[in-house]
Amino acid sequence: MKDWLDEIHWNSDGLVPAIAQDRKTGRVLMMAWMNREALSLTASENRAIYWSRSRGKLWRKGEESGHVQKLHELRLDCDADVIILMVEQIGGIACHTGRESCFYRVYEQSGWKTVDPVLKDPDAIYPAGH
């Protein structure tokens, strides 16, 4: 029997884009990367675990902020190269800027406009030096 992780088309760095979507509202919350270990742990722990390219390590979403993403469903696209995580966003904040979603800017007439409010000051979310 083929391992379900072998069905993923990983990029040349061994990563796959992972989109977190609110399971109730359908809103796209964020996009991050997963390696094989992150995806396997996400499935087994029922919470979003990503691969931080900048830190070069696993990143358990909410480990510092408390804004955990509880996994309800994993979906794989038709080309097997993008994952969607249907999640419950604990605390209502997915973005490190303190907003509900990382997609808080809208293109309007040749520029980007911020349309979503900061729900919590990032300095109040993350420890000093983050």
Curated annotation (Swiss-Prot):
EC class, as a word, reads hydrolase
EC no. given is 3.5.4.19
Locations listed in the record: Cytoplasm
Pathway named in the protein's UniProt entry: Amino-acid biosynthesis; L-histidine biosynthesis; L-histidine from 5-phospho-alpha-D-ribose 1-diphosphate: step 3/9
Which free-text remark accompanies the cofactor?
Binds 1 Mg(2+) ion per subunit. Binds 1 zinc ion per subunit.
- Which reaction is the catalytic activity of this chain? 1-(5-phospho-beta-D-ribosyl)-5'-AMP + H2O = 1-(5-phospho-beta-D-ribosyl)-5-[(5-phospho-beta-D-ribosylamino)methylideneamino]imidazole-4-carboxamide
Keyword annotations of the record: Amino-acid biosynthesis, Cytoplasm, Histidine biosynthesis, Hydrolase, Magnesium, Metal-binding, Zinc
Q: Which domain of life is it from?
A: Bacteria
GO terms classed as biological process? L-histidine biosynthetic process
Task performed by this protein: Catalyzes the hydrolysis of the adenine ring of phosphoribosyl-AMP.
Under the heading PANTHER family, the entry gives: HISTIDINE BIOSYNTHESIS BIFUNCTIONAL PROTEIN, HISTIDINE BIOSYNTHESIS BIFUNCTIONAL PROTEIN HIS7
The record ties this protein, via NCBIfam families, to:
PRK00051.1 (NF000768)
Quaternary arrangement and interactors, per the entry?
Answer: Homodimer.
- This one is known as Phosphoribosyl-AMP cyclohydrolase
Recorded source organism is: Pseudomonas syringae pv. tomato (strain ATCC BAA-871 / DC3000)
Q: Which gene encodes it?
A: hisI
